[in-house]
């Protein structure tokens, strides 16, 4: 047993303009090569575009999109007696949000379009409405977990 104590879990800080933790999580995931100011610009432009498109609060659209994409269950590879099984496991809220943000950004990057702010805003609006690539990814994950329900006891 280790003598060192367990590390305290860091709470996500909120961003300077919207004072929201989700926005900051999104900024930290979109960040490339340490260019945080560029990441903030992209996110704020995307939120402004959402405001123009939907004429509603962009934070509520963001929350709704992330809530819609957040998975409840996922599959994890587990080796049992020479064969690898996809074992369904429940996901906590923090890990679920992190996965949702990752899927939203991946779907945004895949989209055709002018710039990342435009693509991200389109993906967030679609996800809030219940369509889009990120929602499809969540449904795919849930189907995989449902198909491998028989291996749930391998946890």
Swiss-Prot record:
GO terms for molecular function: rRNA binding; structural constituent of ribosome. The keyword Ribonucleoprotein applies. Coiled coil: none annotated. It comes from the Eukaryota. Keywords: Chloroplast, Plastid, Ribonucleoprotein, Ribosomal protein, RNA-binding, rRNA-binding. Pfam families: Ribosomal_S7 (PF00177). GO terms for cellular component: chloroplast; small ribosomal subunit. The keyword Chloroplast applies. It is found in: Plastid, Chloroplast. InterPro entries: Ribosomal_uS7 (IPR000235), Ribosomal_uS7_bac/org-type (IPR005717), Ribosomal_uS7_CS (IPR020606), Ribosomal_uS7_dom (IPR023798), Ribosomal_uS7_dom_sf (IPR036823). Part of the 30S ribosomal subunit. One of the primary rRNA binding proteins, it binds directly to 16S rRNA where it nucleates assembly of the head domain of the 30S subunit. HAMAP family: Ribosomal_uS7_B (MF_00480_B). This is Small ribosomal subunit protein uS7cz/uS7cy. It comes from Acorus calamus var. americanus.
């Amino acid at each position: 047993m280790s003598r060192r104590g367990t590390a305290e879990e860091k709470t996500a800080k909120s961003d300077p303009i919207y004072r929201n933790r989700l926005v900051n999580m999104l900024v930290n995931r979109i960040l490339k090569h340490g260019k945080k100011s560029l990441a903030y610009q992209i996110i704020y432009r995307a939120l402004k575009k959402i405001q123009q498109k939907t004429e509603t609060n962009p934070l509520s659209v963001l929350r709704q999109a992330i809530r819609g994409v957040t998975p409840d269950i996922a599959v994890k590879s587990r080796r049992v007696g020479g064969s690898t099984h996809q074992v369904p496991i429940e996901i906590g809220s923090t890990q679920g949000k992190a996965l949702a943000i990752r899927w939203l950004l991946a779907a945004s990057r895949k989209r055709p379009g002018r710039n990342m702010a435009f693509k991200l805003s389109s993906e967030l609006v679609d996800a809030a409405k219940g369509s889009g690539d990120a929602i499809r990814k969540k449904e795919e994950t849930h189907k995989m977990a449902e198909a491998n329900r028989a291996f749930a006891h391998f946890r």
